[in-house]
């Protein structure tokens, strides 16, 4: 089956290219791969990953659905598994992939993103420098078990990471209608992690103060968007607070070009699929979680006010106001 799908893709690429251009040469330039790496993919020894499929699809206007076949029962997944030895490089590649996804979605007014989150979504915190840095610091701490841990204040992000974070925020904020279901204990879980690192003497008092202030700023922005029901650039924002906890984070992205489903695994890693059946199942699951949740955008004024006041109190109490 894998070789059959690979053959369909190669045939589609050949049909899309002028006769004088060789497939191998074109793919080497397009994907920035060496000759042998390209030939392994052409022969079917190695599968094209979803990022490569996305690049090929965009460059040659090839429909991946057509390549796979609408009636094909095979579900394709890609795992963004970030390893210790190339942590920042792989993190950057993941940001580039999703930034490109948002860039493609924003040209379609009907585009939408739905998510059920058991931790703070990227789009909520990535614009806050210390919070974004802490998430990466925590992941590096967890992955690099064989190396000494530097204090948070001495942990520096590469400039490329900072730049790509900003680009991700820019594209995701100007993209599409958003529905977010947030587990009610998300912030408490994050704060407990921050407090743990403080007890390890890896965070100092100033770090705690900075993170606290950014969290309060984030809550103020979320409350404002919840009241208006508007996400950033005048897109609809449906915000739910769940009364139960989720086992992981699920998201569903949709526009006329494609559907994309993602499931968070092992904290930082993501399993993603463009397979329509998987996407629809994920969408249905996310929507089913609304049964356990309370809509607080443009409604539920009392519940919303109590929720945000309680979150601010938790932040101040845990982080030693």
Describe every region a protein language model picked out:
Residues 1-5, 32-39, 125-133, 148-164:
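Charged, low-complexity, helix/coiled-coil-prone segments
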Residues 1-81:
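Basic, Lys/Arg-rich alpha-helical nucleic-acid-recognition elements, primarily the DNA-binding modules
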Residues 3, 17, 88, 205-212:
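Generic detection of long, well-ordered alpha-helical segments
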Residues 8, 12, 26, 37, ...:
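Exposed alpha-helical structural elements
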Residues 12, 16, 30, 101, ...:
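Residues that form generic nucleotide/phosphate-binding pockets
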Residues 73-150:
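Helix-turn-helix/homeodomain-like alpha-helical modules used for DNA recognition
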Residues 137-311:
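Hydrophobic protein-protein interaction segments
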Residues 314-321:
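Long, charge-rich alpha-helical interaction segments
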């Amino acid at each position: 089956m894998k070789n059959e799908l690979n053959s369909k893709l190669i045939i589609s690429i050949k049909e899309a290219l002028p006769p004088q251009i060789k497939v191998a040469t074109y793919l080497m330039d397009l994907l920035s791969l060496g000759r042998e790496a390209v030939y392994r993919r052409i022969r079917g020894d190695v599968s094209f990953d979803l990022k490569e499929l996305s690049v090929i699809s965009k460059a040659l206007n090839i429909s991946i659905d057509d390549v796979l076949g609408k009636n094909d029962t095979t579900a394709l997944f890609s795992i963004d598994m970030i390893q210790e030895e190339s942590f920042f490089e792989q993190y950057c590649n993941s940001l580039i992939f999703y930034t490109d996804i948002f860039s493609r979605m924003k040209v379609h007014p009907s585009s939408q993103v739905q998510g059920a989150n058991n931790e703070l979504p990227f789009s909520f915190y990535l614009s806050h420098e210390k919070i974004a840095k802490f998430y990466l610091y925590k992941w590096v701490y967890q992955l690099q078990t064989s190396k000494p841990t530097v204090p948070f204040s001495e942990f520096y992000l590469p400039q490329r990471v900072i730049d790509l974070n900003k680009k991700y925020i820019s594209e995701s904020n100007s993209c599409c209608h958003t529905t977010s279901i947030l587990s009610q204990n998300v912030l408490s879980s994050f704060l407990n992690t921050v407090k743990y690192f403080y007890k390890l003497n890896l965070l100092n008092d100033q770090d705690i103060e900075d993170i606290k202030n950014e969290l309060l700023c984030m809550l103020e922005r979320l409350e404002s968007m919840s009241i208006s029901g508007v996400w950033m650039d005048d897109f609809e924002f449906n915000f739910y607070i769940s009364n139960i906890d989720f086992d992981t984070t699920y998201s569903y992205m949709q526009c006329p070009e494609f559907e994309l489903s993602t499931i968070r695994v092992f904290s930082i890693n993501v399993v993603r699929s463009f397979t329509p059946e998987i996407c629809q199942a994920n969408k249905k699951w996310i929507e089913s979680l609304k049964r356990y949740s309370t809509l607080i955008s443009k409604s539920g004024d009392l519940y919303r006010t109590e929720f945000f006041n309680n979150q601010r109190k938790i932040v101040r109490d845990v982080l030693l106001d």
